[in-house]
């Protein structure tokens, strides 16, 4: 019959070092730590097999299809410098293995069962190359950076936000008051915390109403367009869309979603709704560290960031480099560029394993949030540039005089940094002087500078190259 039963080495079929990758292939870079005694070729081939067409034994039905056409192939293996028995295995997947426009299906294949595979001690997906042939099947972000700036009429500077704290426990009316004070003081956005959905102390509909009132009142007073990220995340997709519909009916400019806990299917549905109805979409990455914080196992955040750009979102949290949460500078800037730019060159020093061409898929604004305050403003302005959202939760609400003065302090600091940069000053070197000079003209900023003059969160990053 030509069918030979039994178990054979994966590497006989799935390790193909001579393979020349196609422009339509999805390419993956895995950090593979094999069990002792398992050769790297076998481990790399096993990853390619188990995440595509393979199973543990030869099966009769293999003969009914063309495996050569559909199989994943491990086409290159390189040892990781400084690590014993660890390799970067490159795998190419034919495009036909994936459903069009479905991040869910892409991840089910590439990071599915294979991560529980016994022959591997650990496995981490470091990067994915999404070919234009596949990215073109996605809508992507509902609006993108340029359209958002046009909607908000704000140019030439980062946008300012603030997460309303305490994150849980406020009534809807008091929550709306906090939103109003921040927006009136000079912020562009305020934000629902990611855990605020619809709890007994504050149901979603009440919150939406009071926040809408805060938005329109502060807009009328300041003459600027304002927004509040209304968290539409819910227990079912239907409920989530219902909340987004209500936000649109109130005239709110932006809604929010927790894309990892909510799931990619829900996120893509919401992104489609947002584009059809002119809502911006803010994405929070709650749960990302469960997946991306271990260096040897899981998935790097740059992969989750690429997946979000496909699934759809106009903002996404991307670490701060300087605040209280994980993030190394070069690596963070690597995935920040992957979110914003049309074309990103391969650059291993920034953790970018593949050249990525997004072919005019709209960009996503990175959001810096978590333990940042006015003294960080020069560094943030320099590191993230204009196309970003800088979010100060405690750094606004913790101001000794209250929310509105806290917002004023942040806005004055930001405008001072942008002006200094435009005049050609070096923010990295002169940052503290720039803030000090500005605080002479702004008592609010001076008070903020005094409160946070010594606060730092300095720990070694877990996830290095």
UniProtKB/Swiss-Prot annotation:
Keywords for the protein's UniProt record, in alphabetical order: Calvin cycle, Carbon dioxide fixation, Chloroplast, Disulfide bond, Lyase, Magnesium, Metal-binding, Methylation, Monooxygenase, Oxidoreductase, Photorespiration, Photosynthesis, Plastid
Signal sequence, renumbered to the chain: none
EC number(s) from the headed UniProt entry: 4.1.1.39
Biological process annotations from GO: photorespiration; reductive pentose-phosphate cycle
Keyword Chloroplast: yes
Post-translational modification: The disulfide bond which can form in the large chain dimeric partners within the hexadecamer appears to be associated with oxidative stress and protein turnover.
Pfam families: RuBisCO_large, RuBisCO_large_N
Family per record: Belongs to the RuBisCO large chain family. Type I subfamily.
Record's protein name: Ribulose bisphosphate carboxylase large chain
UniProt organism field: Bursera inaguensis (Elaphrium inaguense)
């Amino acid at each position: 019959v030509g069918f030979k039963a039994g178990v054979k080495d994966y590497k006989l079929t799935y390790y193909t070092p001579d393979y020349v990758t196609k422009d339509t292939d999805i390419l993956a870079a895995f950090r593979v730590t094999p069990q002792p005694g398992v050769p790297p070729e076998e481990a790399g081939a096993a990853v390619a097999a188990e995440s595509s067409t393979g199973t543990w034994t030869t099966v009769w039905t293999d003969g009914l299809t063309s495996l050569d056409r559909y199989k994943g192939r491990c086409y290159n293996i390189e040892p990781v410098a400084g690590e014993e028995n660890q390799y970067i295995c490159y795998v190419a997947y034919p495009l036909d293995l994936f459903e069009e426009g479905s991040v869910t299906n892409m991840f089910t294949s590439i990071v599915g069962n294979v991560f529980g595979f016994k022959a591997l001690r650990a496995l981490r997906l470091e990067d994915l190359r999404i070919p234009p042939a596949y990215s073109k099947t996605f809508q992507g972000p509902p609006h993108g950076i340029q359209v958002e700036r046009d909607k908000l009429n704000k140019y030439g500077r980062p946008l300012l936000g603030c997460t309303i704290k305490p994150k849980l426990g406020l009534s809807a009316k008091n929550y709306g008051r906090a939103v109003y004070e921040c927006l009136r003081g000079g912020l562009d956005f305020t934000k629902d915390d990611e855990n605020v959905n619809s709890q007994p102390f504050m149901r979603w509909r009440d919150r939406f109403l009071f926040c809408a009132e805060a938005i329109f009142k502060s807009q009328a007073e300041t003459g600027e367009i304002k927004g509040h990220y209304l968290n539409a995340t819910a227990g079912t997709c239907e409920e989530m869309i219902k909340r987004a519909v209500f936000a649109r009916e109130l005239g709110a400019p932006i809604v929010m979603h927790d894309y990892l806990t909510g799931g990619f299917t829900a996120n893509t549905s919401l992104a489609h709704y947002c584009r059809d109805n002119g809502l911006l979409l803010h994405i929070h990455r709650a749960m990302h560290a469960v997946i991306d914080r271990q260096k040897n196992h899981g998935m790097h955040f740059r992969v989750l960031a690429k997946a979000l750009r496909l699934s759809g979102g106009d903002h996404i949290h991307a670490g701060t480099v300087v605040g209280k949460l994980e993030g190394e500078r070069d690596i963070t800037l690597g995935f920040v560029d992957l979110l914003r730019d049309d074309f990103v060159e391969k650059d291993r020093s920034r953790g970018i394993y593949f050249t990525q061409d997004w072919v005019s898929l709209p960009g996503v604004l990175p959001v810096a949030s978590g333990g940042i305050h006015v003294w960080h403003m020069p560094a943030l302005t320099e590191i993230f540039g204009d196309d970003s959202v800088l979010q100060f939760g405690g750094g606004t609400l913790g101001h000794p005089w209250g929310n509105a003065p806290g917002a004023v302090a942040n806005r004055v600091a930001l405008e001072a940094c942008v002006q200094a940069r435009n005049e050609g000053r070096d923010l990295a070197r002169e940052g503290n002087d720039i803030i000090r000079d500005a605080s002479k003209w702004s008592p609010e900023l001076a008070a903020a500078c005094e409160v946070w003059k010594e606060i730092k969160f300095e720990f070694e990053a877990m996830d290095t190259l």
